[in-house]
């Protein structure tokens, strides 16, 4: 039988002084009314609260805190805190590998809803020729897979297939640019190279399957020549996706994948790359440049989306599926507005065929510019009905292309005498009278749907405003306005 002192004041109502810890171990609450001298080291595993302000809490010697999971705040409850000596507050932890938190964008901002889609593409019914251009060589071929909403790219021997977006996408300094590209590359084959990503012929970031070698590649032309820096899977600096990385996942390169990269270009920023697997962004490799390079790491971040299949002789195939390019943190329209018009004396129109009034295209040496038609104006010089059309890529008769000025990205024509072919993207009616009118090509402040594109071979789109009259040789005046995004 245990020894008890039922009349001992120190032991009466002992249960009232007891409490249990989080691990259900008994603890004794005590109230210390006088000072305690402590020598040596005292480890306090939980929280220590000092709340008897405005009393003085003297501390001598050194107080060391190994780690703090939350920000530290000091509340003096309206009094004052006096500190003698030096306080050293260590900076937040620095990860030399880079920004590994995929809940934030390339600049460390929390990924929230303020994202502006610059481009998206799916292939539900066809090869989407308004958005994509194709270049074939040798045995290269494409085939639309209706039931898979995909494009099959294939070779039966030596040959190649390139699928590239007709437009490049406007990068704004200080905003993260996120690219997502989906594909199925199939079985790795010797002598066959397969690529997909955010890149063009001279610059960009992409995933590559070179035979059986898996790479993430940075392409740059800053030296005047194209240089590919390919990082093979064993040398990825975050998650090698070989089962040993933070995710524990093995990359199945022959299966359908979502490749992503986000770019903080600014000429010298970092580029994060990886895959989206099981709904999670997994960072595989980060290209760092600030504090390392002597200049920019690639010429521009305004680039196209591109897929490639190249074979030196083997039969091969891969599938292009979907892609998207997003400006994270929104997009602010800081474009330059430019316009050109016919002479005020007007241009004689036919009553049978459409006559081009104003046409624009990208300059041959500025094919990576972002140019978006925004509005047009029409005025008939006779009291009669007229019709207009906006035509993409007509064949113009006797055009005389001129540069608006040295700063503009556009050449224009107001001299062509006729046109044929092309795709009508809008049409309507206007009436000759004592006043004209403006018509918007796009209905929002920032709308890239009518952006001028170019082919892989370097041929610009032509955007043409044309009109037809009720009576032959009736005259009309026209002007075309566009935005140039740097």
Regions found by a protein language model. Name each.
Residues 1-134, 332-385, 428, 433:
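Extended, low-complexity segments enriched in Ser/Thr/Gly and acidic residues that occur primarily
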Residues 225-258:
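Short, aromatic/His-centered strand-loop micro-motif at the edge of beta-sheets
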Residues 171-185, 329-469, 477-485:
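Beta-rich globular "head" domains
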Residues 254-270:
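Localized edge beta-strand/strand-to-loop motifs within extracellular or lumenal beta-rich domains
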Residues 90-219, 224, 231-237, 288-353, ...:
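Low-complexity, Ser/Thr/Pro/Gly-rich disordered linker/stalk regions
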Residues 273-275, 390:
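Conserved aromatic beta-strand anchor motif in extracellular beta-sandwich/beta-rich domains
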Residues 13-17, 205-212, 263:
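Broad, structure-driven detector of short, well-ordered beta-strand segments within folded domains
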Residues 189-211, 280-283, 459, 467-486:
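C-terminal interaction-tip segments
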């Amino acid at each position: 039988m245990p020894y008890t002192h039922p009349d001992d004041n120190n032991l009466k109502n002992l249960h009232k002084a007891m409490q249990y810890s989080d691990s259900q171990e008994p603890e004794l609450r005590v109230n210390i009314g006088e000072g305690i001298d402590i020598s040596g080291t005292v480890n306090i595993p939980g929280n220590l609260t000092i709340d008897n302000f405005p009393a003085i809490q003297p501390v001598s010697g050194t107080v060391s805190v190994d780690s703090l999971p939350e920000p530290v705040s000091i509340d003096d409850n309206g009094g004052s805190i006096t500190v003698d000596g030096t306080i050293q507050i260590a900076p937040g932890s620095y990860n030399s590998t880079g920004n590994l938190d995929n809940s934030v964008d390339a600049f460390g901002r929390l990924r929230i809803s303020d994202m502006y889609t610059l481009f998206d593409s799916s292939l539900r019914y066809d090869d989407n020729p308004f958005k994509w251009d194709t270049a074939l060589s040798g045995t290269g071929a494409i085939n639309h897979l209706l039931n898979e909403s995909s494009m099959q790219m294939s070779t039966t021997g030596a040959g190649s297939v390139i699928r590239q977006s007709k437009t490049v996408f406007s990068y704004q300094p200080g905003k993260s640019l996120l690219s997502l590209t989906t594909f199925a590359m199939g079985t790795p084959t010797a002598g066959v190279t397969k690529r997909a990503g955010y890149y063009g012929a001279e610059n960009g970031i992409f995933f590559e399957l070179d035979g059986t070698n898996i790479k993430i590649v940075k392409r740059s032309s800053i030296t005047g020549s194209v240089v590919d820096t390919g990082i093979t899977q064993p040398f990825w600096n975050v998650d090698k996706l070989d089962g040993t990385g933070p995710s524990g996942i093995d990359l199945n390169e022959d299966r359908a994948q979502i490749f992503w990269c986000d770019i903080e270009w600014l000429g010298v920023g970092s580029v994060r790359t990886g895959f989206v697997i099981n709904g999670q962004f997994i960072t595989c490799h980060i290209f760092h440049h600030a504090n390392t390079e002597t200049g920019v790491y690639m010429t521009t971040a305004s680039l196209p989306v591109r897929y490639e299949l190249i074979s030196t002789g083997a039969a091969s195939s891969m599938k292009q599926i979907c892609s998207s390019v997003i400006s994270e943190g929104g997009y602010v329209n800081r474009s330059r507005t430019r316009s050109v018009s016919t002479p005020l004396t007007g241009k004689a129109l036919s009553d049978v065929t459409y006559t081009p009034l104003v046409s624009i295209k990208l300059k041959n040496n500025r094919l990576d510019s972002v140019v978006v038609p925004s509005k047009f104006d029409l005025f008939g010089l006779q009291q009669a009905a007229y019709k207009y059309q906006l035509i993409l890529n007509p064949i113009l008769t006797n055009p005389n292309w001129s540069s608006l000025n040295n700063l503009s990205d556009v050449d224009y024509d107001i001299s062509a005498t006729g046109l044929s072919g092309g795709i009508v993207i809008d049409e309507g009616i206007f009436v000759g009278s004592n006043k004209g009118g403006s018509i918007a090509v796009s209905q929002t402040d920032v709308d890239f749907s009518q952006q001028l594109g170019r082919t892989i071979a370097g041929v610009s789109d032509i955007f043409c405003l044309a009109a037809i009259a009720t009576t032959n040789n009736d005259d009309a005046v026209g002007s075309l306005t566009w935005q140039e995004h740097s």
